[in-house]
Regions:
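Phosphate-group recognition and catalysis centered on beta-loop-alpha active-site segments
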Residues: 204, 208-212, 223-519
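Hydrophobic alpha-helical membrane segments
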Residues: 1-271
Length: 519
């Protein structure tokens, strides 16, 4: 496997001396440009960068075939590639999905509709996409044939239909082996960067830039080697040694400059520690005043995030789940109970006991402890219709205590903002398609699993704060801090507090962020 991999890399290196050397350099420049635009600009500009990058591949094919310019063939190849890319979109596009997300910015109200109806369409769309993706493997050889010798859509469909799925999968094993080899080298490189952090941060920075540049170069050389197998004549030397050296040096400078820019420098702003549901590990029952008191005493978090939802008689109780079954062992939705049936209800979790509080009771304890709250208003029952009453009763006191409100339902924060414009409100979203510039949200609570550099940059360009939830593992805490998060919502605020200030491995975590961004 190693010998085949090395042979492929050497074949790719010969492309830098071949007739397509300038085209390969253009591809590297476009690939870097698209990523930089996605992070720095977004919107239409980064979408244009993606379109230019997508046009490069069919142009390369035409050049490799020595074809004269034919708009029809170019468009046919481009559409085939885009059609395939759509099925492979959820797999990340080697990091360019984040660029696409930064380019397509939907109004928050539209994203709100998509998310709030997810349980209606996702059970259908998810299996449908998975089935389509598995079937799409059958058409990969057909795509390759149409790129090298385009005929018609009919032949494309017929070729894919006739070939067996297992045959295609077996033929792709070399690709998997090369990917595994690249990943192993990335792991080894990451270990070296970690070790260099113990020497000094400057050494760690240099090693991280070197490793990231090398990994990018290796990926490109593997791609070039695969190209040489399809078009062997493109690896025949066509440039003098000094021209080859100049083109190679330019490519290395582009990749190295991008690596240095992407890795950046350690953030200087303090990270907000936000205790999720008011707990510190398993020190109490979530969303209870007993857990709140222990957490504040042990950790003194910057904010305590807690959940409220309306009752049948238009009061508010502190509860995360829509039903009482998990914590209280009682049937029925919370919003169907009157407040007097809920207040003081015994709750059990992790072998501990607590009592269900009204928001008024919980808020009073937080005020006594001088603890700012981040209140999540659950979108259940008539929550969005009660924002006027909520604002009248709690907005000014939340402002005075440096608190804030966020919700998964954009209608909630929009109506609350209309009644109390000075109260900080945030939009909770598990995925990012939002146009941050036209939103009442002053901050965003984003799902940590889908965190990207593009998300943070887009929000910061519009002077929005970014929190990530729910971040409980040390690796995730460190890498999201390195990525530039303004705060982390965690069930382990004590652990996060202990990790603060341990920045000697910043470049290791940024390298991890870059590797994760390929997914």
């Amino acid at each position: 496997m190693l010998s085949r991999g090395w042979h492929l890399v050497m074949q790719g290196a010969r492309q830098l001396a071949g007739p397509l050397a300038c085209w390969w350099l253009a591809g590297i420049l476009l690939a870097v440009l698209a990523k930089v635009l996605g992070i720095l600009v977004g919107g239409v500009v980064s979408l244009l960068g993606l379109l230019l990058l997508s046009a490069w591949l069919p142009a390369m094919v035409a050049r490799s075939n020595h074809e004269s310019w034919q708009a029809g063939q170019f468009l046919y190849r481009w559409v085939l590639l885009m059609f395939t890319a759509v099925w492979w979109l959820p797999l990340g596009w080697l990091g360019y999905l984040a660029t696409l997300q930064a380019s397509i910015q939907l109004p928050a109200t539209v994203q709100n509709i998509i998310f709030n109806t997810r349980y209606d369409w996702l059970p259908v769309a998810g299996p449908f996409w998975l089935l389509g993706w598995l079937i799409s493997w059958k058409w990969l050889p057909a795509l390759q044939r149409q790129l090298t010798a385009p005929t018609s859509w009919r032949n494309y469909w017929r070729t894919g239909w006739r070939i067996s799925w297992w045959t295609v999968f077996k033929k792709s094993r070399n690709v998997w082996l090369f990917l595994i080899s690249w990943l192993v080298m990335a792991i080894i490189g990451g270990g070296i960067v970690w070790a260099s952090g113990a020497v000094s941060q400057l050494v760690s920075q240099f090693v991280a830039v070197f490793m990231m540049t090398g990994l990018q170069l290796l990926a490109w050389l593997m791609f070039m080697g695969w190209w040489s197998r399809l078009w062997p004549e493109t690896a025949i030397a066509g440039h003098s040694n000094w021209q080859t050296g100049l083109l190679t040096l330019t490519g290395l400078l582009v990749l190295g400059g991008y690596a240095g820019w992407w890795l950046g420098t350690p953030p200087t702003a303090p990270l907000a520690i936000i205790a999720h549901r008011g707990v510190n590990g398993r020190d109490g029952v979530q969303n209870t005043t007993a857990a709140l008191k222990r957490t504040v005493k042990q950790v003194q978090p910057d904010m305590v995030e807690m959940d409220i939802q309306p009752t049948a008689d238009r009061h508010w109780v502190v509860m995360h789940d829509p039903t009482l079954k998990a914590l209280a062992g009682q049937p029925g939705p919370v919003h169907e109970y009157p407040v007097d049936k809920l207040s003081g209800l015994p709750l059990r979790e992790h072998g501990q006991k607590g009592y269900l509080s009204t928001f008024k009771q919980y808020f009073a304890v937080a005020h006594k402890l001088q603890q700012p709250l981040l209140v999540e208003i659950k979108s259940v029952g008539t929550a969005d219709q009660l924002m006027g009453i909520f604002a009248d009763n709690y907005a000014q006191r939340l402002i005075q205590q440096k608190g804030a409100v966020h919700s998964l339902d954009y209608r909630v924060i929009e109506r609350l903002h209309q009644r109390a414009a000075q109260l900080p409100v945030g939009f909770i979203t598990p995925f990012y398609l939002t146009d941050f510039s036209n939103s009442v949200a002053g901050f965003y609570s984003l799902q940590a699993l889908t965190a990207t550099r593009e998300q943070i940059s887009a929000a910061h360009r519009q002077h929005r704060i970014v929190y990530f939830w729910t971040v409980d593992r040390p690796l995730a805490m460190q890498r999201l801090t390195a990525m530039g998060a303004d705060g982390l919502i965690t069930n382990r605020p004590g652990q996060l507090r202990r990790l603060q200030g341990q920045s000697k491995h910043y470049y290791f975590y940024q390298l991890i962020n870059w590797l994760v961004s390929w997914l």
